[in-house]
Amino acid sequence: ENVMEPSPDSLVAIARGIDDPRFGLCLDIGHANTVVIQTPPLDWLEPMRPYLRHVHLHDNHGHLDEHLPLGDGSMPIPALLDALSALPDVTITLENQSVAPSLQYLSAHGYL
């Protein structure tokens, strides 16, 4: 899982070096957004794509790891969800302090 890396490069290099189908990466979208100055969250998906197995999904304002409900921060949630829909084998965990508002957001925007 990415924690505070400025880009996906080091994680991709590790996965490439291990080169084992049992090994995969977890992308925490909210963590990626806390280092947005270096690599925006959407830009993490493509390089990680061959190794991506799981995503932690929550929102924030780009500074703190707030774990806000989807739509309560500044992240491009619709664009992220659209990009994730192209990765049907990747599982997603909602990592919000309260999941109900995120489920309402997903339903209101046609994702559920």
Predicted feature descriptions by range:
Residues 8-112:
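Histidine-acidic metal/acid-base catalytic patches
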Residues 1-2, 107:
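Catalytic cores of phosphodiester-bond-cleaving enzymes
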Residues 2-3, 10:
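Conserved anion-binding
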